[in-house]
Amino acid sequence: MRNHPGGLEFIVMALILVFEGLGAPVVRGAQDTSKNLTLKLRTRVEPFKGSGDWREVNFEGRFPVNSTAIVICDMWDKHWCSGATARVEVLARKMVPLIDRARASGVQIIHAPSDVVGLYNQYPQRIRILGIPVTEAPPSLDLPNPPLPIDDSDGGCDTGEKFYQAWSRENPAISITGDDVISADGKEIYSFLAQRGIKNLLIMGVHANMCILNRSFAIKQMTKWGIRCVLVRDLTDSMYNPKDRPYVSHDQGTQLVIEYIEQYWCPSMLSTDLAQALPR
């Protein structure tokens, strides 16, 4: 009898099979591989359930360009927390060349600046998504929703400010152009994905423990509707104050949230791997 692979090797093989041919059936010898993105993904598994012993697993997933979109979540011009504003500025500068290259390669770009979408009502990119026929989303999957590994109950600001609505638009460094669309409504975005045959979302922006997880267009709800999400983990940040549990640095708090997402919601990837995978 042939030996079966065990443990993590079996898990990796299973993950590769799941992600093989995302978005469309694969016809061997007939697919145009130049229009696939082969991305290095990271997830976390608990081989012995209930043990609390989580293992990092790295694997590759293949994403057809025409069934993949980037969602830019809440990358505003200003945040009520000055520390968050400063970190978002750094993220925006990193995002811009990647977004521009992805757009040029045929990846759909979705701008999702919550609370300020009305500013863009006359933009063709906003009008485009408003013209999409409504597609009813399926019943949401009943998935576990464990608590976060950090305490963000005070808003998570590490520079002392109190909440006010500071944002007025998406960060101006990020271009809105071409075939992009603008929406911060999960049902609008789901209808757009359904019409375009998009099954995979690469999600970047802020904040990992709040909007990235909880917006109607973001990881939790899209996953519950059967959309395959991937967090771009080096293009996100958290709202976490090191004065709160578990009393680690801000960056360590962000990493804990990323690991939580990998454990319970979706894989993550690096922006550098996406840049490398994009057709040149």
Where are these regions (language model features)?
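Boundary at the C-terminal end of the N-terminal hydrophobic targeting segment
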Residues: 23, 29-30
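Active-site-adjacent betaalpha module
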Residues: 30-69, 86-88, 97, 104-106, ...
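Carbohydrate-interacting regions of secretory-pathway proteins
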Residues: 121
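Bacterial N-terminal signal peptides
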Residues: 9-21
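Acidic/histidine-rich, surface-exposed loop or edge segments in extracytoplasmic proteins
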Residues: 68-83
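Short catalytic helix/loop segments, enriched in acidic residues and glycine
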Residues: 94
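N-terminal secretory signal peptides that target proteins for export/translocation
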Residues: 1-6
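A cross-domain feature marking catalytic cores of carbohydrate-active enzymes
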Residues: 75, 111-114, 233
